[in-house]
């Protein structure tokens, strides 16, 4: 019975509403924590997952063996792979496309790759001006990988204990 009476008085005095208004008033006059984005940037996590890249072996041969595990594991169905057999009997990709509008940057493709071919880089800033530019093809992915290979290798070596 006493519990109902206290609940009645709390509701009558609108204590929950006043508590919420006090919290709003308290944060209204505190300094805001903002970043002026293009000029200032937040520090990135060492495990940040950004734009994709395809890697090569040190001899220049691409690493991808067209096992299609990344295509199978992708929850957003953003990866499309076509493959063909070469003269020596190995499989290689003829087409490797990633639709960045579909991709959710979960990192499953990177985790499932048995030869560390597909990796996600630290690149956060990219834009598209025309229709169809959101689909990154194999030559573009290889170019990104070639340009950032030393940084990718350093990041993977630093993160090796957690893989």
Swiss-Prot record:
Cofactor notes: Binds 2 [4Fe-4S] clusters per subunit.
Which annotated residues bind [4Fe-4S] cluster 1? Answer: 64, 67, 70, 113
Q: GO biological process annotations for this chain's record?
A: aerobic respiration
Query: Known catalysed reaction(s)?
Result: a quinone + NADH + 5 H(+)(in) = a quinol + NAD(+) + 4 H(+)(out)
Any single GO CC term annotated in Swiss-Prot or TrEMBL for this entry: plasma membrane
User: 4Fe-4S ferredoxin-type domain: from which residue to which, for each copy?
Assistant: 54-84, 94-123
Q: Which UniProt keywords apply?
A: 4Fe-4S, Cell inner membrane, Cell membrane, Iron, Iron-sulfur, Membrane, Metal-binding, NAD, Quinone, Repeat, Translocase, Ubiquinone
Q: What is the recorded membrane topology of this protein? A: Peripheral membrane protein
Its function, per the record, reads: NDH-1 shuttles electrons from NADH, via FMN and iron-sulfur (Fe-S) centers, to quinones in the respiratory chain. The immediate electron acceptor for the enzyme in this species is believed to be ubiquinone. Couples the redox reaction to proton translocation (for every two electrons transferred, four hydrogen ions are translocated across the cytoplasmic membrane), and thus conserves the redox energy in a proton gradient.
Question: Which protein family is named in the record?
Answer: Belongs to the complex I 23 kDa subunit family.
How the protein assembles, per its UniProt entry?
NDH-1 is composed of 14 different subunits. Subunits NuoA, H, J, K, L, M, N constitute the membrane sector of the complex.
Q: What is this protein called?
A: NADH-quinone oxidoreductase subunit I
The record's gene field reads nuoI
């Amino acid at each position: 019975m006493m519990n109902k009476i206290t609940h009645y008085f709390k509701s009558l005095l609108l204590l929950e509403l006043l508590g919420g208004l006090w919290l709003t008033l308290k944060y209204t006059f505190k300094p805001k924590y903002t970043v002026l984005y293009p000029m200032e940037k937040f520090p990135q996590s060492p495990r940040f997952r950004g734009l994709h890249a395809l890697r090569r072996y040190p001899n220049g041969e691409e690493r991808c063996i067209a096992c299609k595990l990344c295509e199978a594991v992708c929850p957003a169905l953003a990866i499309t792979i076509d493959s063909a057999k070469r003269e020596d009997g190995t499989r290689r990709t003829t087409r490797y496309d990633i639709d960045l509008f579909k991709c959710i940057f979960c990192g499953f493709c990177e985790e499932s790759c048995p030869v560390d071919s597909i990796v996600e880089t630290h690149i956060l800033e990219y834009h598209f001006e025309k229709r169809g530019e959101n689909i990154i093809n194999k030559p573009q992915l290889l170019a990104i990988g070639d340009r950032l290979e030393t940084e990718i290798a350093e990041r993977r070596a630093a993160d090796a204990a957690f893989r």
